[in-house]
């Protein structure tokens, strides 16, 4: 920590003030990620609990993809970390499981999936009051000319749970069911 610099971007003023109080030596910026002036290819690590939502973000560098906000955070962070840099995010299961693979197709040739773990929908119930199935996803930005060697994670396949229900989930988790904590079941909820 002594030889590192921490930069934080937080749109909520109260949360930004708390971060500034907790980390007085950090550069905490109270603004949206899309408007933060951050150098491309500079950061060693990007860490976020990405915002949930299905609304687009206006950013000329990524507008063509029409990424919803949580996908935008992945794509924008990939621009900001250096080759070999890491992205470690808490995100909804939609990042890995949605049938629209636009984000995964965008990321896969540029970043290697180092790993992911699926948390049960109750993981944040006590402290945040939410019941959303979330994933912790870790990516490494590839070096120029490097080919990804990590596991397959672009496609969604059917997974049969303990009740013999077929559930569409990411191929990474189909091949590694031990990385899904809790019990998989179909519900009528968004995530």
Q: Which residues make up each language-model segment?
A:
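Conserved S-adenosyl-L-methionine
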Residues: 1-55, 84, 92-94, 137
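Short, solvent-exposed coil/turn linker segments
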Residues: 2, 32, 55, 68, ...
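Conserved Class I SAM-dependent methyltransferase catalytic core
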Residues: 9-13, 18, 30, 64-125, ...
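A short acidic, often aromatic-flanked loop/helix-cap motif at beta-alpha or helix-coil junctions
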Residues: 34-38, 122-126, 189-190
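Flexible loop residues that form catalytic
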Residues: 51, 121, 142
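Conserved ATPase-coupling elements of RecA-like P-loop NTPase cores
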Residues: 55-59, 99-100
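Generic "edge-of-domain/loop-turn" microfeature
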Residues: 57, 96, 144-146
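Flexible, glycine-/basic-rich loop-and-beta segments that form/coincide
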Residues: 126-191
């Amino acid at each position: 920590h002594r030889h590192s610099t921490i930069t934080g971007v937080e749109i909520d003023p109260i949360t930004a003030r708390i971060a500034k109080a907790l980390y007085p030596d950090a550069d905490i910026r109270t603004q949206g990620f899309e408007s933060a002036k951050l150098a491309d290819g500079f950061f060693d690590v990007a860490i976020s609990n990405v915002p949930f939502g299905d609304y687009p973000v206006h950013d000329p560098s990524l507008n063509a993809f029409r990424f919803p906000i949580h996908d935008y955070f992945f794509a924008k962070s990939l621009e900001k970390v250096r080759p070999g840099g890491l992205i470690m995010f808490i995100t909804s299961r939609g990042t890995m499981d949605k049938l629209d693979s636009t984000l995964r197709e965008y990321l896969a040739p540029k970043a290697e999936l180092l790993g992911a773990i699926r948390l049960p929908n109750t993981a944040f119930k006590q402290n945040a009051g939410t019941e959303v199935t979330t994933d912790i996803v870790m990516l490494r930005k590839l070096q120029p000319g490097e080919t990804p060697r990590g596991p397959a994670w672009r496609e969604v396949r059917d997974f049969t749970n303990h009740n013999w229900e077929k559930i569409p989930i990411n191929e990474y988790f189909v091949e590694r069911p031990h990385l899904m904590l809790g019990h998989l079941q179909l519900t009528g909820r968004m995530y």
